[in-house]
């Protein structure tokens, strides 16, 4: 009997203990803490402070000096050795892995036995003038070998000969002016255009559409020579002997021209070279403004239509076609012998594995290859990426590990069409679209030294504002102020003077495949020029032999503090995205941006008010979808601030909705004629790859619509793209609703 009572007592104790446990569990489940504790917030902030404090300007300077001693053109031995050097350093920094990943892509190089040049020939076919083959090397670099001469990668081979026509910047509107207002036909002509305003590949495409048989590109002092500044090496201006290199593809996001949509591996089917995507069918060649002045001096024909067609050379900028007076029998001949060949390239991919969510990735990537020394483009970004990786490694050595996985990437062959980054995205597409939270670009960290410039998805606006308020400004006169304060004062948003300007993402760098094709939230930050006063395009010595370490050290960032600020911002962005319990995206900013973009495209359409009425075109569905998205974003935000941060399932569900929102704006069918540009809200402009356009499908349908051959079909296309945009936004709103 005593034994039975003992067993009963034991079972009663166990039952009571179980009941107590269940009661505690239920209380803990239903009475949810809504906020992170003050201690956890302070710890999170302290780690970020340690990260940014670890970064040193002197280290960035040292990396930049080391990486710019030799040229590192994609596909060359020097660039492979630089990849190995970066890989070795990443391992030394303490990254969990650092691997070389190769692809075999189509690249383009000058012919080593036949030099490219432009000539003027007389009636006897005698060449009476030739442009320069090479740029004179800067002091201290006279003995450096393997410097590629100025050329335009992927130009067609050929020796076309004909009359010359000056076409200003070779923009769409420039050719419209020539053809529609001035009656000048470029068919069968060689055209000469100045660099600037738009991507060089768009210039070549426009020239081909106009019927030109070749195009010469040059950097006019009006666009690449700042007033009261000496040419390099005495100043940072462009010497007259320098010529801008660059590819002239029109890939529209395809990656390797021979394997569009698929990674360029050994097993991959390849198109024939003559079938390659976006490869020009006409010769293209760049020259310096000293040589351009000679070609332009002899032009006859019509005077320039207005001052916007005049540069700063001592010539009349007559349009042509052909030369004037006694020189009218002379022609221009191009000599272009570039060779396209399949070449192996190498990315370096490093990782720090996450401790809680290793299957969620934040990518920090930038390209390594350059046309010559590349001290600004890209190596100011390479040096910054290296210092960020070192600083994260330092945190690791002290016991810290991120919540999510960080992927560091040193891309190859960006200058040849964003090839390294695109091929890696294609190879890993199934993983990336399921697991990637964000892509932060680490291309050039400076393109000027006036103020910060940020281009990013609206999801990142608030995070950028927050972090720049906590980073000291490197600008003179702002010693006791934040980066945010100097940025706001120098470059306020045109829509809201109380906020600094943030630009839309276009293309022109390695974020393209991740944002435009895969819908991964992306952003980039660097220092830039004063756009109000500095009217020159880009920085003057862009893509020339004169882009040296000394250029940066003497003129652009002597203290390296501006590059340090960029490193701190890029690094802090990665840290917050990888280690915040809730992904720090703000969906309400996206809703506000959609309102502004919808109003903007509608106002553009109102220039054709009568046609809108005649063809029954309405934007009501678009505005309705934007309204629904705004309401869904507001409801989501209310739920987000109430989520139980101690419930990992609830946190994961909300984070998945945040992560996948950008993906919701992707149309798998792509934009018309641009299969790999799939983002319905943002895309590179069809007329300038560098610029971002909102509602690109609608914008392109409306562009020049008054000159379309079939007005009914043209407006029908507008209706179609309004419908696609409305559906996409409505569907995106659906992804924000509470999970059933």
From Swiss-Prot:
Residues holding Ca(2+): 259, 262, 423, 426
GO MF assignments: carboxypeptidase activity; dipeptidase activity; dipeptidyl-peptidase activity; metal ion binding; metallocarboxypeptidase activity; N-formylglutamate deformylase activity; serine-type peptidase activity
Function description: Has N-acetylated-alpha-linked-acidic dipeptidase (NAALADase) activity. Also exhibits a dipeptidyl-peptidase IV type activity. Inactivates the peptide neurotransmitter N-acetylaspartylglutamate.
Protein name per UniProt: N-acetylated-alpha-linked acidic dipeptidase 2
Annotated residues for binding of Zn(2+) 1: 367, 377, 443
Localization annotation: Cell membrane
The keyword Metal-binding is annotated on this UniProt entry: yes
Taxonomic source organism: Homo sapiens (Human)
Catalytic activity: Release of an unsubstituted, C-terminal glutamyl residue, typically from Ac-Asp-Glu or folylpoly-gamma-glutamates
Location of region: NAALADase: 264-577
Family membership noted in the UniProt record: Belongs to the peptidase M28 family. M28B subfamily.
Binding site for Zn(2+) 2: 377, 415, 543
GO biological process, one term: proteolysis
């Amino acid at each position: 009997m005593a034994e039975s009572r003992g067993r009963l007592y034991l079972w009663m104790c166990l039952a009571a203990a179980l009941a107590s446990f269940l009661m505690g569990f239920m209380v803990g489940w239903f009475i949810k803490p809504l906020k992170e504790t003050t201690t956890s917030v302070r710890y999170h902030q302290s780690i970020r402070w340690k990260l940014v404090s670890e970064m040193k300007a002197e280290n960035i300077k040292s990396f930049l000096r080391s990486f710019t001693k030799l040229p590192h053109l994609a596909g060359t031995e020097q660039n492979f050795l630089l990849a190995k050097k970066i890989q070795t350093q990443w391992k030394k920094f303490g990254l969990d892995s650092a691997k070389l990943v190769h692809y075999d892509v189509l690249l383009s190089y000058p012919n080593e036995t036949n030099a490219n040049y432009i000539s003027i020939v007389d009636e006897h076919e005698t060449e009476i003038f030739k442009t320069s083959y090479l740029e004179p090397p800067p002091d201290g670099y006279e003995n450096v070998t393997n410097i590629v001469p100025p050329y335009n990668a992927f130009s067609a081979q050929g020796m076309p000969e004909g009359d010359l026509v000056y076409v200003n910047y070779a923009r769409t509107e420039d050719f419209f002016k020539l053809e529609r207002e001035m009656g000048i036909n470029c068919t069968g002509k060689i055209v000469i255009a100045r660099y600037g305003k738009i991507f060089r590949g768009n210039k070549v495409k426009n020239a081909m559409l106009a019927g030109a048989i070749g195009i010469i590109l040059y950097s006019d002092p009006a666009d690449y020579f700042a007033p009261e500044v000496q040419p390099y090496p005495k100043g940072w201006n462009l010497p007259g002997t320098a010529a801008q290199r660059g590819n002239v593809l029109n890939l529209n996001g395809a990656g390797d021209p021979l394997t569009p949509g698929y990674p360029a591996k050994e097993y991959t089917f390849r198109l024939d070279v003559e079938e390659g995507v976006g490869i020009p069918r006409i010769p293209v060649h760049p020259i310096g403004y000293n040589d351009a002045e000679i070609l332009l001096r002899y032009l006859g024909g019509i005077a320039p239509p207005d001052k916007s067609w005049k540069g700063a050379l001592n010539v009349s900028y007559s349009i042509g076609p052909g030369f004037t007076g006694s020189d009218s029998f002379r022609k221009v001949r191009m000599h272009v012998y570039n060779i396209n060949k399949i070449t192996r390239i190498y990315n370096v991919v490093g990782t720090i594995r996450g401790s809680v969510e290793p299957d969620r990735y934040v990518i920090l990537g930038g390209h390594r290859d350059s046309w010559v020394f590349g001290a600004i483009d890209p190596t100011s970004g390479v040096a910054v990426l290296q210092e960020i990786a070192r600083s994260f490694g330092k945190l690791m050595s002290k016991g810290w590990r991120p919540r999510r996985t960080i992927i560091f990437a040193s891309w190859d062959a960006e200058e040849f069409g964003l090839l390294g980054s695109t091929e890696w995205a294609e190879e890993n597409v199934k993983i990336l679209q399921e697991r990637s939270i964000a892509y932060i670009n680490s291309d050039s960290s400076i393109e000027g030294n006036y103020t910060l410039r940020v281009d990013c998805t609206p999801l990142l606006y608030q995070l950028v504002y927050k972090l720049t308020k906590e980073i000291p400004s490197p600008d003179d006169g702002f010693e006791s102020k934040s980066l945010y304060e100097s940025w706001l004062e120098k470059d306020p948003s045109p829509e809201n003077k109380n906020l600094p300007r943030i630009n839309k993402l276009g293309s022109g760098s390695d974020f393209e495949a991740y944002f435009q094709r895969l819908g991964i939230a992306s952003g980039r930050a660097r220092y830039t020029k004063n756009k109000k006063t500095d009217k020159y395009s880009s920085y003057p010595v862009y893509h020339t032999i004169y882009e040296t370490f000394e250029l940066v050290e003497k003129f652009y960032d002597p203290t390296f503090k501006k590059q340090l600020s960029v490193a701190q911002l890029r690094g802090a962005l990665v840290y917050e995205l990888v280690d915040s319990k809730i992904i720090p995206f703000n969906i309400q900013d996206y809703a506000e941006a959609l309102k502004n973009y919808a109003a903007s495209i509608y106002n553009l359409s109102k220039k054709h008010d009568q046609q809108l009425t005649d063809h029954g075109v309405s934007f009501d569905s678009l505005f309705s979808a934007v309204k629904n998205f705004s309401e869904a974003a507001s409801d989501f935000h209310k739920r987000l601030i109430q989520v139980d941060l101690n419930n990992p399932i609830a946190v994961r569900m909300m984070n998945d909705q945040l992560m996948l929102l950008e993906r919701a704006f992707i149309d798998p069918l792509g934009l018309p004629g641009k299969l790999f540009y799939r983002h319905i809200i943002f895309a590179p402009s069809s007329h300038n790859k560098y610029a971002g356009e909102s509602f690109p499908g609608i914008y392109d349908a409306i562009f020049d619509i008054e000159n379309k051959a079939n007005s009914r079909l043209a407006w029908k296309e507008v209706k179609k793209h309004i419908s696609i945009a409305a559906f996409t936004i409505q569907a995106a709103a659906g992804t924000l609703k509470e999970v059933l």
